[in-house]
Amino acid sequence: MDPEPLPEAKRERLPVTEAVRPEWAGIDLMATLDLVRLMNSEDRSVPEAVAGQLEQIAAAVDAVVTRMTRGGRLVYAGAGTAGRIGVLDASECPPTFNTAPGQVVGLLAGGPQALVSAVEGAEDRPELALADLEELKLTPDDTVVGISASGRTPYAVAAVRHARTTGALTLGLACTRGSDLVAAAALGIEVEVGPEVLAGSTRLKAGTAQKLVLNLLSTAVMVRLGKTYGNLMVDLRAGNEKLRDRAERIVAQATGADEKTVRRALTATDGRAKDAVLVVLADVDAPTAARLLAASDGRLREALALSTRKA
């Protein structure tokens, strides 16, 4: 028997992420290929929904960069799938962009245990968000991004509200419009992807949308901070065999130098690819490369220009 529709008054209170599409009530009766085709078809709408928020995402990137240039941090706060996606993005910044410890932070309602198992009720406790953020001792140069598919998760909303009282920049990322989360934040990104094929399972389209937005946000922020050279991850520091191979490829691609020159530069710079590129292109020693990068806030193009002026 198909599920009965909700009463009209109850349905109006539900965010779109919790809505039930009657035409999908029989997915458990579908052939497997038809089921995955339906899900894949719905997934195609997600990039289009994200594209509708690119101006807001770009504005957020520029605002975050302004603060991180002054030493601020980027902090994600969420519960369940949304919080795990924030933690994932934060954890990928050090190996990709050589960010400093604590420069990008992921807060998850319920703590590390909630990464691998549900911590019942954690998302409904705003006091947990306050405790997590108070431990960080926020400053006006920090940015707190509350992430919630419905836009009404108490943990995420409380995180943004508290962060705003400290003067930190606040951003609300929701998958519905007119949410409490976005209303509480200084900047809002509303990626409305519509009901899920499996009603209320926001690890699907909503989770994909959140991952895409955070990919855009953190990557664009790091590009603007000079963590790349063109589209190369030059802030990589080689600490194992795989990373040493990658560092060699990056330096070779950036400089056009032969293998022997690349390896010599990486050895001199203790495996720091950005420094090694500067050693080769500016024809300087490793200490000089380090000084040029420090004077250029780590931006390789500016360090190269500075080396030319000093030559």
Can you say where each PLM-predicted feature lies in the sequence?
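Cofactor-/ligand-binding subdomain signature composed of acidic, glycine-rich
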Residues: 1-49, 53
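Gly-rich Lys/Arg/Thr-decorated short loops/hinges at beta-loop-alpha junctions or inter-strand turns
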Residues: 17, 38-46, 106-117, 229, ...
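A short, well-structured juxtamembrane/interface segment
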Residues: 52-67
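Helix N-cap / loop-to-helix initiation motif
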Residues: 53, 139, 152, 257-258, ...
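Glycine-rich phosphate-binding loops that contact phosphosugars or nucleotide phosphates
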Residues: 75-213, 221-223
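Short, amphipathic alpha-helical interaction segments embedded in low-complexity terminal/linker regions
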Residues: 216, 221-311
